Amino acid sequence: MSVLFINGSPNKKGNTARLASELLDGRAYETLDLVDYKLYSYGQKFDDDQFDEIVSRMKAADIIVVGSPVYWHNMCGSVRNLLDRFYGPIRSGELSGRKFVFLFQGAAPEPWMLEKAEYTMSRFARMYGMEYVGMASNSGEARAIAQKLG
C-alpha cells in the first residue's frame, strides 16, 4: 500500500513531520515537502509550475496524508494553495479509492480552528472521491487514526 505524506510546513523536520511519523509509525511512506515545489496561486500560469507533478504523486498513492501547522488561526498557505489549485483542473471523484487524513498541529489550536479545518478537509476529500479517515492534532489522535488505517 503506497502512502504519501504532503508536508505543508516550511520546517521539513518540524512538528508536522513528527506528527506524521507518529501516525504512520511502522509504515513505509514518501514525503512531499510543499516548500520544495513551485506551486503558483490559483489563476497564475507559469511553465515551471509543479502542480501536475504533485497531483500525479497523489494519484499514485493509496493513502494521502496532508499536514499543516496552524498559522494565523488556520491551515498554512501552502496547503490552502494546493486545495485552491484543485478547483477546475481536477474532476470531482478523480482521487476515488484513496484514504485521506489531515494533520493540523500547533501550540494551542482552539476548537473553532479545528472545526473549520476539519470541515474544509473533509469536504475536499469527499469532493474528489477520497475516504476521509479523520483529522489529528496531537499524538493520541494520530494513534487512533492509525488504527483506522489498519
Language model region names:
Residues 1-91, 122, 126-150:
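N-terminal beta1-alpha1-beta2 submodule of the flavodoxin-like/Rossmannoid cofactor-binding fold
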Residues 96-135:
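Short, glycine-/small-residue-rich phosphate/pyrophosphate-handling segment
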